[in-house]
Regions:
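Beta1-alpha1 glycine-rich phosphate/pyrophosphate-binding loop at the start
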Residues: 23, 54-65, 73-75, 102, ...
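Ferredoxin-type iron-sulfur electron-transfer modules and their immediate structural context
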Residues: 1-140, 191
Length: 203
Protein backbone atom coordinates (compact mmCIF):
# COMPACT_ATOMS: atom_id res chain seq x y z
CA UNK A 1 0.00 0.00 0.00
CA UNK A 2 1.10 3.57 -0.70
CA UNK A 3 0.28 6.05 2.06
CA UNK A 4 -0.94 9.48 0.99
CA UNK A 5 -2.30 12.49 2.87
CA UNK A 6 -5.81 11.43 1.81
CA UNK A 7 -5.41 7.87 3.06
CA UNK A 8 -3.70 5.09 1.19
CA UNK A 9 -3.80 3.57 -2.26
CA UNK A 10 -3.91 -0.20 -2.55
CA UNK A 11 -2.25 -1.79 -5.55
CA UNK A 12 -2.97 -5.34 -6.76
CA UNK A 13 -0.31 -7.84 -5.76
CA UNK A 14 1.99 -8.95 -8.55
CA UNK A 15 3.63 -12.35 -8.64
CA UNK A 16 7.40 -12.32 -8.46
CA UNK A 17 9.43 -13.81 -11.33
CA UNK A 18 11.11 -16.29 -8.96
CA UNK A 19 7.76 -17.70 -7.83
CA UNK A 20 6.55 -18.86 -11.25
CA UNK A 21 7.90 -20.93 -14.08
CA UNK A 22 8.60 -18.78 -17.12
CA UNK A 23 6.92 -19.80 -20.35
CA UNK A 24 5.19 -18.49 -23.49
CA UNK A 25 2.01 -17.79 -21.53
CA UNK A 26 3.91 -15.19 -19.49
CA UNK A 27 5.07 -13.31 -22.57
CA UNK A 28 3.13 -10.21 -23.66
CA UNK A 29 3.38 -9.20 -27.30
CA UNK A 30 2.55 -5.59 -26.41
CA UNK A 31 5.09 -5.36 -23.59
CA UNK A 32 6.44 -2.08 -24.96
CA UNK A 33 3.09 -0.35 -24.57
CA UNK A 34 2.40 -1.93 -21.19
CA UNK A 35 5.84 -0.88 -19.99
CA UNK A 36 5.11 2.78 -20.71
CA UNK A 37 1.83 2.96 -18.80
CA UNK A 38 3.43 4.32 -15.62
CA UNK A 39 5.73 6.78 -17.43
CA UNK A 40 5.07 10.37 -18.45
CA UNK A 41 4.84 10.95 -22.18
CA UNK A 42 8.00 13.05 -22.01
CA UNK A 43 9.95 10.39 -20.14
CA UNK A 44 10.98 12.97 -17.53
CA UNK A 45 10.02 13.70 -13.94
CA UNK A 46 6.78 15.67 -13.34
CA UNK A 47 8.65 18.70 -11.95
CA UNK A 48 10.91 18.97 -15.00
CA UNK A 49 7.96 18.43 -17.34
CA UNK A 50 6.01 21.25 -15.67
CA UNK A 51 8.95 23.70 -15.74
CA UNK A 52 8.73 26.02 -18.80
CA UNK A 53 12.54 25.99 -19.04
CA UNK A 54 12.70 22.20 -18.50
CA UNK A 55 15.42 22.55 -15.88
CA UNK A 56 16.61 19.26 -14.32
CA UNK A 57 14.94 19.97 -10.98
CA UNK A 58 15.63 16.58 -9.43
CA UNK A 59 19.28 16.93 -10.46
CA UNK A 60 20.00 20.26 -8.78
CA UNK A 61 18.00 19.26 -5.68
CA UNK A 62 20.25 16.22 -5.25
CA UNK A 63 23.42 18.27 -5.79
CA UNK A 64 22.22 20.88 -3.29
CA UNK A 65 21.47 18.15 -0.74
CA UNK A 66 25.10 17.03 -1.12
CA UNK A 67 26.35 20.58 -0.59
CA UNK A 68 27.52 20.87 -4.22
CA UNK A 69 26.01 24.30 -4.77
CA UNK A 70 28.30 25.39 -7.60
CA UNK A 71 27.57 22.18 -9.52
CA UNK A 72 23.84 22.71 -8.90
CA UNK A 73 24.18 26.25 -10.25
CA UNK A 74 25.99 24.91 -13.31
CA UNK A 75 23.13 22.48 -13.96
CA UNK A 76 20.51 25.24 -13.68
CA UNK A 77 22.46 27.53 -16.02
CA UNK A 78 22.42 24.94 -18.77
CA UNK A 79 18.81 25.93 -19.38
CA UNK A 80 18.40 29.27 -17.60
CA UNK A 81 21.01 32.05 -17.34
CA UNK A 82 18.83 34.01 -14.86
CA UNK A 83 18.57 31.72 -11.80
CA UNK A 84 18.40 34.53 -9.21
CA UNK A 85 15.66 36.36 -11.13
CA UNK A 86 13.59 33.21 -11.61
CA UNK A 87 14.09 32.30 -7.96
CA UNK A 88 12.15 35.45 -7.10
CA UNK A 89 9.40 35.65 -9.73
CA UNK A 90 8.85 32.02 -10.76
CA UNK A 91 5.24 30.82 -10.41
CA UNK A 92 6.44 27.42 -9.13
CA UNK A 93 4.79 25.10 -11.60
CA UNK A 94 7.29 22.45 -10.56
CA UNK A 95 5.92 22.50 -7.01
CA UNK A 96 2.35 22.13 -8.30
CA UNK A 97 3.43 19.00 -10.17
CA UNK A 98 5.58 17.60 -7.34
CA UNK A 99 4.36 14.09 -6.48
CA UNK A 100 5.50 14.55 -2.89
CA UNK A 101 2.37 16.68 -2.52
CA UNK A 102 0.28 13.50 -2.62
CA UNK A 103 2.02 12.31 0.56
CA UNK A 104 2.24 15.51 2.64
CA UNK A 105 3.43 18.68 0.88
CA UNK A 106 5.49 19.51 -2.18
CA UNK A 107 9.24 19.99 -1.94
CA UNK A 108 10.15 23.69 -1.57
CA UNK A 109 11.89 23.66 -4.95
CA UNK A 110 11.79 27.42 -5.51
CA UNK A 111 13.37 28.17 -2.12
CA UNK A 112 16.21 25.75 -2.87
CA UNK A 113 16.73 27.33 -6.31
CA UNK A 114 16.74 30.80 -4.78
CA UNK A 115 19.38 29.73 -2.24
CA UNK A 116 21.53 28.21 -4.99
CA UNK A 117 21.11 31.33 -7.13
CA UNK A 118 22.38 33.49 -4.25
CA UNK A 119 25.72 31.71 -4.67
CA UNK A 120 25.91 33.19 -8.18
CA UNK A 121 25.67 36.72 -6.77
CA UNK A 122 28.74 36.01 -4.64
CA UNK A 123 31.95 36.49 -6.65
CA UNK A 124 33.71 33.63 -4.83
CA UNK A 125 31.06 30.99 -5.57
CA UNK A 126 29.93 32.32 -8.96
CA UNK A 127 29.71 29.99 -11.96
CA UNK A 128 30.88 31.40 -15.29
CA UNK A 129 30.99 28.65 -17.96
CA UNK A 130 34.08 28.14 -20.06
CA UNK A 131 33.83 28.79 -23.78
CA UNK A 132 33.45 25.72 -25.96
CA UNK A 133 35.92 26.62 -28.71
CA UNK A 134 36.12 24.32 -31.77
CA UNK A 135 39.54 22.65 -31.95
CA UNK A 136 39.92 22.95 -35.74
CA UNK A 137 38.73 26.47 -36.55
CA UNK A 138 39.19 28.18 -33.19
CA UNK A 139 36.81 30.97 -32.22
CA UNK A 140 34.23 32.00 -34.79
CA UNK A 141 35.05 35.20 -36.66
CA UNK A 142 31.46 35.95 -37.66
CA UNK A 143 29.80 38.94 -36.02
CA UNK A 144 26.36 38.36 -34.52
CA UNK A 145 23.97 41.16 -33.59
CA UNK A 146 21.28 40.49 -30.99
CA UNK A 147 18.49 43.06 -31.21
CA UNK A 148 17.01 43.78 -27.81
CA UNK A 149 18.60 43.41 -24.39
CA UNK A 150 15.66 41.75 -22.69
CA UNK A 151 15.77 38.31 -21.07
CA UNK A 152 15.45 36.52 -24.44
CA UNK A 153 18.15 38.60 -26.14
CA UNK A 154 20.56 38.32 -23.22
CA UNK A 155 19.96 34.57 -22.98
CA UNK A 156 20.65 34.24 -26.70
CA UNK A 157 23.90 36.20 -26.37
CA UNK A 158 24.93 34.15 -23.31
CA UNK A 159 24.61 30.81 -25.09
CA UNK A 160 26.23 32.12 -28.29
CA UNK A 161 29.23 33.35 -26.27
CA UNK A 162 29.42 29.98 -24.56
CA UNK A 163 29.70 28.33 -28.00
CA UNK A 164 32.63 30.53 -29.01
CA UNK A 165 30.84 33.36 -30.84
CA UNK A 166 31.17 37.07 -30.03
CA UNK A 167 27.65 38.51 -30.03
CA UNK A 168 26.84 42.21 -29.63
CA UNK A 169 23.57 43.16 -27.92
CA UNK A 170 21.78 46.30 -29.12
CA UNK A 171 19.31 47.89 -26.71
CA UNK A 172 17.49 51.21 -27.19
CA UNK A 173 16.88 51.78 -23.48
CA UNK A 174 19.52 53.28 -21.22
CA UNK A 175 20.12 49.93 -19.53
CA UNK A 176 19.52 46.32 -20.59
CA UNK A 177 17.03 44.00 -18.93
CA UNK A 178 13.83 44.67 -20.86
CA UNK A 179 10.69 43.78 -18.91
CA UNK A 180 12.80 42.60 -15.97
CA UNK A 181 13.87 46.21 -15.43
CA UNK A 182 10.89 48.13 -16.78
CA UNK A 183 7.87 45.87 -16.37
CA UNK A 184 8.18 44.12 -13.00
CA UNK A 185 7.88 46.35 -9.91
CA UNK A 186 10.82 46.55 -7.52
CA UNK A 187 8.91 45.09 -4.58
CA UNK A 188 8.50 41.91 -6.63
CA UNK A 189 11.96 41.85 -8.21
CA UNK A 190 14.84 43.92 -6.86
CA UNK A 191 16.59 45.79 -9.67
CA UNK A 192 20.03 45.29 -8.13
CA UNK A 193 19.53 41.52 -8.52
CA UNK A 194 18.75 41.97 -12.24
CA UNK A 195 21.78 44.24 -12.70
CA UNK A 196 23.99 41.75 -10.86
CA UNK A 197 22.91 38.89 -13.11
CA UNK A 198 23.44 41.00 -16.23
CA UNK A 199 26.97 41.80 -14.98
CA UNK A 200 27.55 38.05 -14.60
CA UNK A 201 26.41 37.53 -18.21
CA UNK A 202 28.94 40.15 -19.33
CA UNK A 203 31.71 38.04 -17.83
Amino acid sequence: NLCTKDGYIEYPRQELPDDVKWGPEKWSVDYRDRNRINCYDTGTSPCKTACPAHIAVQGYLKLAAQGKYREALQLIKRENPFPAVCGRICNRRCEDACTRGTVDQAVAIDEVKRFIAQQDLNAETRFVPEKVIPKVDGEFSEKIAVIGGGPAGLSCAYYLAEKGYRPTVFEREARPGGMLMNGIPSFRLEKDVVEAEIDILRE
